[in-house]
Amino acid sequence: MLLVDKVAQRVVACAAFVVSGGVPTVAVALSGGRDSAALLHAVAAWRDAAGVPVRLVALHIHHGLQADADAWEAACARMAAAVGAAFRVRRVRVSTDAGRGIEEAAREARYAALDALCAETGATLLLTAHHLDDQAETVLLQLLRGAGLDGLSAMPMARERRVTLLRPWLDVPRGDIEAYARAHALAWVEDPSNGDARYARNALRPLLAGMAGHFPAYRASLARSAAHLAEAAALIEEVAQTDLARIAPAGTLAVAGLAALSGPRQRAALRAWLAGAGLRAVSSRRLEDLRAQLLGARADGAPCVRLPGAQVRRYRGQAWIEAAGQPGAGPADCPIAVSRFDPARAEVQRVDVAAWGGALLFSPAQAEGIDARILQAPLSLAARRGGERIVLRPGGPSRALKQAYQEAGIPAWARARLPLLYAGERLVFAAGLGPDRSAVAMGSGWHVAWLPAVGQDGLDAG
């Protein structure tokens, strides 16, 4: 029962498993293969043995890449029914139009579909059957591709995003899962592509089998190295965020501040800055080109560096990220209601506003924050219409918003995508400038930030 015990320990330890006032929904990603079939069985065994009040749902992604895909879906439905789990399926179209390989494209489509199904079913926790051999393969593949620390860190045991992803068997060898499946006489489907050497993982497996004779502990050793690299990556990220707090406090990046850093810290800060805007898949070559153009252009130059899905501009000593192909148009004139912020909850709150392509981040502030009483009025985001005025220093006069943007060095092409936050009819915050000081509380209040989203979140390997 070792594998069932691992499921029990790691699921219960997840904060996402605890649902206040209700029964948690735990989802299992079920491809129909041996590993995921064993995981579904083990989760159900834990549920039944412990009498845990949990709703179990099996999620199957139909890629349509194999002739037997419909039969696999039917097999997965039977597996779910056998253990009393709900069953949901999502059909996806795998596109390689963006220059990605079929494996990467299928993985991205699969994770996006799993996230969507979790949202539909109310699942707070998603389990996948990745194991120690998968982790070893991932580390070696990333090494052969010349990946950086993030790639070489491979797959984390848990990942916090829209739903918590947990890999409870990431330290379990494939052989243990095979033994579990045989011991319980489980049925599963065989994917013929697993023997196709055109796929990178399959091509690597015979080499790993040979390696095991000389290095029997290679799986655990590679996983241990990945853990060390993940810790190093976390340290670099911490340093980068400290640098960004100083050189990019309002979202735009001060080029002079970047130039004052060492080369490695420049690259780390740029990666973190781009990642904060959703741009995670930026190659080393593109990053170096961006660094060179930001730091090497003439003082009066205005370089524009194109990246996948976005572009970076430099203007008056500041670097800006904007979505590619969008010349500076905001959403429709009608205000967009901001209804998911609760000033009574003293915690960081993120409110995504799809119409504006970004999010508002509300953080409790001991000083210099917008008065919570003012924020109790209906909140809305709106575009500039002309004639707005704002107070930017305590006790100071109001000034024209257009003039304030000009003095702040915000270029005209960027202003149209900077929303204004209103509490009722009162302007309380202007993206790119900050709060209206007449709305700032003497004591505690709320710090507001605007986070433009110009790309999509990255996906974990696997």
From Swiss-Prot:
Pfam family, one: TilS_C
Entry keyword Cytoplasm: yes
Catalytic EC class: ligase
Molecular function per GO: ATP binding; tRNA(Ile)-lysidine synthase activity
Gene3D superfamilies reported for this sequence: 1.20.59.20, HUPs (3.40.50.620)
Keyword Ion transport appears in the UniProt entry: no
HAMAP family: tRNA_Ile_lys_synt
Domain remark from Swiss-Prot or TrEMBL: The N-terminal region contains the highly conserved SGGXDS motif, predicted to be a P-loop motif involved in ATP binding.
Identification of the protein by name: tRNA(Ile)-lysidine synthase
Taxonomy of the source species: Bacteria, Pseudomonadati, Pseudomonadota, Betaproteobacteria, Burkholderiales
The gene coding this protein: tilS
